[in-house]
Amino acid sequence: MIRLVLLFVILPLTSYSDKHIPYYKSLAHDESWLRHYPENQDLNKQTEKFLLTEENMPVKVIEEFRNSWSSYTDWYRIELFNGIQGWIAHNQLSKKRTLLILEDIELYALKSYDPESWMTIQKGIILAPKIVNLLEVKETMVKISIPKGNKSSVKGWIPIDYRLWGVSDKEMQTLND
């Protein structure tokens, strides 16, 4: 009886996640291997699927894998913007939130826009493809920053639509509830 109780107490701890899947992270390095399955000791490199070469590229986490002896998630099953899926080691991902601009999009100075209003100030056009930093999510727009170099950046608002990849439906539902 005691073993059964311990089993129910211990098992949830090994599969617990503080995030609701799916959620987004970004690549931490400019070279990361996407694998067929979560295996680090592959001497013949048979699990390697693709070499991802874009640091800060947003990825969607769709599954977590934790070894029974580990206190943290060891591997993440991710999906890329084009639908490709695979496994990546925990140290290859960052909590930094980024977005991928899939098509050219307008950058606005304010968090609302109306083509008929004099209050709408267009700061420019972001040419795709482009990775940008996600700063804030509002109902229909996101605040972003675009690195310019020399530690400076351009900040502004862009509408949330099909031209973006990296904002989840759950984030939008949370804002609208």
Predicted regions and their residues:
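Short, intrinsically disordered, charge-balanced linker/junction segments flanking boundaries
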Residues: 13-14, 37
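Short polybasic amphipathic segments
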Residues: 32-36, 107-110
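Boundary regions of SH3-family modules and the immediately adjacent low-complexity/disordered segments
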Residues: 18-26, 41, 60, 69-116, ...
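Sec-dependent N-terminal signal peptides
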Residues: 2-13
